[in-house]
């Protein structure tokens, strides 16, 4: 099976290249590629950054306005999707969600370090193959609280300038 290759261009930080795994999470990969093709991620930010854990983006603008996307089925073992055995190790891309296992839409996270407690609980669907230095730099930004409910928000926006599909 061919693994799609994508690039995530982050303003002032550089580029992360990732390989996606449709054999692990086919609908997740198809949804992510469709969002990239639609330009959905352009101008959105990494809005939650926890050094030693992960960076999360794909759902908020620089002004912290939420951008909605359609939800898809969560393709992970605890949700009955047994073929996804991807471990949440450094560099893995995975879908963020609420408590509802079928609430993943556009928000994703990139593992800064291994987090085995997420295995089988979230839909991992790819892995950074180049640009781990970019991941490290993003994970090191200063964060704080936004409003009364959002924690680990970067003090200065970490903007996804664009994402591109290198190959399908």
Give short role names for the model-derived ranges:
Residues 1-168:
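Cyclophilin-like peptidyl-prolyl cis-trans isomerases
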């Amino acid at each position: 099976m061919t693994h799609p290759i994508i690039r995530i261009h982050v303003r002032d930080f550089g580029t992360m290249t990732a390989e996606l795994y449709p054999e692990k999470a086919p609908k997740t990969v198809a949804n992510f590629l469709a969002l990239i093709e639609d330009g959905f991620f352009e101008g959105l930010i990494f809005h939650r950054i926890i050094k030693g854990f992960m960076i999360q983006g794909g759902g908020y603008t620089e002004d912290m306005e939420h951008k909605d996307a359609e939800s898809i089925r969560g393709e992970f073992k605890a949700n009955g999707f047994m073929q996804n055995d991807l471990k949440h190790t450094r560099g893995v891309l995975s879908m963020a969600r609420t408590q509802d296992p079928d609430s993943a839409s556009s928000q994703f996270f990139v593992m800064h370090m291994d987090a085995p407690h997420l295995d089988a609980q979230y839909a991992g669907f790819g892995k950074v193959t180049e640009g781990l230095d970019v991941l490290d730099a993003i994970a090191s930004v200063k964060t704080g609280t936004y409003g009364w409910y959002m924690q680990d928000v970067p003090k200065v926006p970490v903007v996804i300038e664009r994402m591109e599909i290198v190959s399908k």
